[in-house]
């Protein structure tokens, strides 16, 4: 179970809607992923498609909870206004907060992010904060009262995987709120590693929506997250510099040398 604030989800995979080539394919991928929570960028999404059904209506039909985000915002003020708009339009106080430093790297502006999160928490929002892989920033966000910290594995859309696994593991070991890896996942093994490092969940969009076969990739991500979670719970063996035999040498037969 994934517990965030006052909600519980069976799935540890959160899927984003960005990059989907069609709403029909997005729907198939959402179902295949098993996700119960999905992000929608308030500034970018076309509310109604040619099929006549809005993405919001589709998510309600699929019984998938909606997580609006502040993608594209460059300042704390923009993020706060976007979150307030989402609350009025969608009747939810949940928001994924993104404040981007520049359009080339899409890396978080942690100064503006901290300001935005503090204001939104004070305004009654349940905040999930997209941040860098810096453990200190993650701690500061937790001090602000966010419901989850969402460190990046690598820059958005790069598919480079987890570039600094040590920092992700450190964030997980220190956090008292859920840690959800967000951004940079390229394939199933990246999602598995995130869970093995101690993450409570994985959020991804491009890895599925821009894959050659999005539905097949969604299925693989479902199994990858579950495999990583089970491995983390099981506990890996220690890494060693020298070999350790799996079978004991005790009890081996002792053969006397025969003289010919």
Curated annotation (Swiss-Prot):
Q: Which reaction does it catalyse?
A: [ThiS sulfur-carrier protein]-C-terminal-Gly-aminoethanethioate + 2-iminoacetate + 1-deoxy-D-xylulose 5-phosphate = [ThiS sulfur-carrier protein]-C-terminal Gly-Gly + 2-[(2R,5Z)-2-carboxy-4-methylthiazol-5(2H)-ylidene]ethyl phosphate + 2 H2O + H(+)
Domain of life, per lineage: Bacteria
The record places the active site at 96 (schiff-base intermediate with dxp)
Enzyme class (EC, first level):
transferase
Q: Where on this chain does 1-deoxy-D-xylulose 5-phosphate bind?
A: 157, 183-184, 205-206
GO MF, one example: thiazole synthase activity
* SUPFAM superfamilies, per the entry: ThiG-like
Where does the record place a coiled coil?
A: none
A Pfam family hit: ThiG
Report the locations given in the UniProt record.
Cytoplasm
**Recorded metabolic or biological pathway in which this protein acts:** Cofactor biosynthesis; thiamine diphosphate biosynthesis
Please describe what this protein does: Catalyzes the rearrangement of 1-deoxy-D-xylulose 5-phosphate (DXP) to produce the thiazole phosphate moiety of thiamine. Sulfur is provided by the thiocarboxylate moiety of the carrier protein ThiS. In vitro, sulfur can be provided by H(2)S.
What does the subunit section of this Swiss-Prot or TrEMBL entry state?
Answer: Homotetramer. Forms heterodimers with either ThiH or ThiS.
What is the protein named? Answer: Thiazole synthase
């Amino acid at each position: 179970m994934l517990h965030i604030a006052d909600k519980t989800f069976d799935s540890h995979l959160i899927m984003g809607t960005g990059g989907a080539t069609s709403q029909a394919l997005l729907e198939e991928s959402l179902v295949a992923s098993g996700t119960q929570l999905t992000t929608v960028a308030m500034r970018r999404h076309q509310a109604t498609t040619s099929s006549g059904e809005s993405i919001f209506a589709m998510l309600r039909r699929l019984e998938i909870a909606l997580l609006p985000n502040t993608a594209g915002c460059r300042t704390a003020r923009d993020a706060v206004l976007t979150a307030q708009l989402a609350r009025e339009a969608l009747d939810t106080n949940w928001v994924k907060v993104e404040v981007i430093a520049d359009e080339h790297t899409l890396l978080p502006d942690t100064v503006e992010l901290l300001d935005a999160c503090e204001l939104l928490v004070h305004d009654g929002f349940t905040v999930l904060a997209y941040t860098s892989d810096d453990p200190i920033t993650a701690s500061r966000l937790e001090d602000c009262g966010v419901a989850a910290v969402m460190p990046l594995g690598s820059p958005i859309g790069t598919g480079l995987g987890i570039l600094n696994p040590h920092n992700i593991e450190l964030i997980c070991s220190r956090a008292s709120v859920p840690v959800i890896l967000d951004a940079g996942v390229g394939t199933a093994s990246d999602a598995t590693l995130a869970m093995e490092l101690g993450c409570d969940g994985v959020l991804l969009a491009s890895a599925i929506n821009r894959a050659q076969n999005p539905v097949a990739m969604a299925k693989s991500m479902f199994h990858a997250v579950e495999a990583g979670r089970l491995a983390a719970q099981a506990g890996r063996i220690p890494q060693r510099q020298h070999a350790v035999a799996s079978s004991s040498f005790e009890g081996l037969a002792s053969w006397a040398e025969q003289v010919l």
